[in-house]
């Protein structure tokens, strides 16, 4: 499949993408990063509907859409009829009736998108910008692009995902596709936050058991909005037991990379001074987020033709 020939009706989960489609999106993102341009003769209207706070995902989608020449339809949850009790379904039904081509949605409800993509009335394409603790496909794709740019492969790579596993949509999206692409996965973090579903994809370890051998060390944000972690750990204890300290950073392979979906709780998951350290690719992940989201929007618009 050519990287610019992929066409998707919606993009709501990594599970709905074939390996071939995943690689096409990654390679198209790299092409955009290297300067590829696209021009649309017809108008394309995109609306970003974020029902949870977001900086990187929301703004990266906006930049991606602007770079593609799309027209952005503003949506502010605070001033919308959501505050009158309007359901998500009726909000998107309205967008569809208005002729919006693509809705990028972040919502706290897991699997919110199912009734939208199954509706015979809603014709707007849906891109999932994150559903509660469920899936985060665009973050997963930018992570994959970052890893692929670094190593040129996934097969045989050792990847450790560490932190607040149970509450992380990033962990769930990444574990599924990385295993499918041939990576060897390890999961680290507090036992209280790691359910058995992760055991189907990799091995439970401590950070110290694998820090010297992994190619990718991916830390996850402690999601304090979804639970009260300080009732279990102080910030200092969490960092000492489960975070990236200078001592652990020094033990990483010279060729290994450090990743985090951000925002980073500095001195909790990662020591403050290591966020931009030489092995860190956290800023690169943000940059890649624009280009892989250009590939996503392009593919979804192509799927509407």
Swiss-Prot record:
GO cellular component terms attached to this protein's record: cytosol
Keywords: Pyrimidine biosynthesis, Transferase
Assigned EC number: 2.1.3.2
Pfam families per record: OTCace, OTCace_N
Its biological purpose: Catalyzes the condensation of carbamoyl phosphate and aspartate to form carbamoyl aspartate and inorganic phosphate, the committed step in the de novo pyrimidine nucleotide biosynthesis pathway.
Record's subunit section: Heterododecamer (2C3:3R2) of six catalytic PyrB chains organized as two trimers (C3), and six regulatory PyrI chains organized as three dimers (R2).
Protein name: Aspartate carbamoyltransferase catalytic subunit
